Amino acid sequence: MSILINYFLLVGFCFALASGLFLGLKSIKLI
């Protein structure tokens, strides 16, 4: 059960990191 929770945390962290990088690149292009 704890493995499943850690898996979801890892997926959520990777998704947040990817979306943060995407928004960062968009803001750099706008400047």
Curated annotation (Swiss-Prot):
InterPro entries linked: Cyt_b6/f_cplx_su6 (IPR007802)
GO cellular component: chloroplast thylakoid membrane; cytochrome b6f complex
Membrane spanning residue stretches: 3-23
UniProt key word Transport: yes
Lipid bilayer topology: Single-pass membrane protein
Entries under Pfam families matching the protein: PetL
Family: Belongs to the PetL family.
Subunit comment: The 4 large subunits of the cytochrome b6-f complex are cytochrome b6, subunit IV (17 kDa polypeptide, PetD), cytochrome f and the Rieske protein, while the 4 small subunits are PetG, PetL, PetM and PetN. The complex functions as a dimer.
Function: Component of the cytochrome b6-f complex, which mediates electron transfer between photosystem II (PSII) and photosystem I (PSI), cyclic electron flow around PSI, and state transitions. PetL is important for photoautotrophic growth as well as for electron transfer efficiency and stability of the cytochrome b6-f complex.
Protein name: Cytochrome b6-f complex subunit 6
UniProt organism field: Thalassiosira pseudonana (Marine diatom)
